[in-house]
């Protein structure tokens, strides 16, 4: 599929701190909250459903200016909150390799199996808090080679 050697891109200038890892059996949690009691039709809803034993990881990452997570994917979904700084991420399946910017106080969802890179292109530390679900015993991160459509991103 690839001509020549394909190298994964490693994280640079990233300091991870694991807060907790917990193991869960099948999860089937659903909640629905009426947010407009007068209308009774306006609901907020959440659903978490897993089949099989899962590991839940909660961690904080501090990424110095110019730092990068390198190209990678995850075997399960992650919820990412940008605590401070600005996260700039790129998706391998985006033909234009356009940056997506997430400011402090906002977040994004990584559905899992999406090859991407998150970088700190700002001038202050980027701090993220991440909650990841992965199959029990699996590594949370899978290193990936830099995609051909993102040549302007040296080292991911």
Name the predicted role of every residue range.
Residues 63, 94-113:
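Short acidic-glycine-tyrosine-enriched beta hairpin
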Residues 1-55, 99-101, 145-156:
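A short, N-terminal "cap"/entry segment at the start of jelly-roll beta-barrel domains
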Residues 103, 112-139:
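Ligand-binding loop in jelly-roll beta-barrel domains
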Residues 71, 89-90, 98, 110, ...:
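Short beta-strand His + acidic residue motifs that chelate non-heme Fe in jelly-roll/DSBH
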Residues 128, 133-156:
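C-terminal partner/receptor-binding element of secreted or periplasmic proteins
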Residues 74-95, 104:
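Glycine- and acidic-residue-biased ligand/ion/polar-headgroup-sensing regions
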């Amino acid at each position: 599929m690839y001509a020549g050697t394909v190298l994964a891109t490693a994280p640079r200038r990233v300091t991870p701190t694991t807060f907790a890892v917990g193991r869960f059996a099948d999860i089937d949690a659903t909640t629905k909250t009426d947010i407009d009691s007068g209308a009774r039709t306006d609901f907020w809803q959440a659903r978490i459903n897993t089949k099989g034993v899962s590991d839940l990881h909660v961690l904080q990452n501090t990424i110095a200016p110019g730092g990068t997570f390198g190209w990678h994917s995850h075997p399960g979904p992650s919820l990412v909150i940008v605590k401070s700084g600005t996260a700039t991420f790129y998706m391998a399946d985006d033909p234009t390799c356009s940056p997506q910017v997430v400011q402090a106080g906002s977040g994004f969802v990584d559905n899992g199996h999406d090859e991407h890179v998150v970088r700190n292109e700002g001038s202050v530390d980027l701090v993220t808090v991440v909650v990841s679900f992965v199959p029990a015993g699996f590594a949370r991160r899978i290193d990936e080679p830099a995609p051909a459509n993102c040549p302007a991103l040296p080292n991911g």
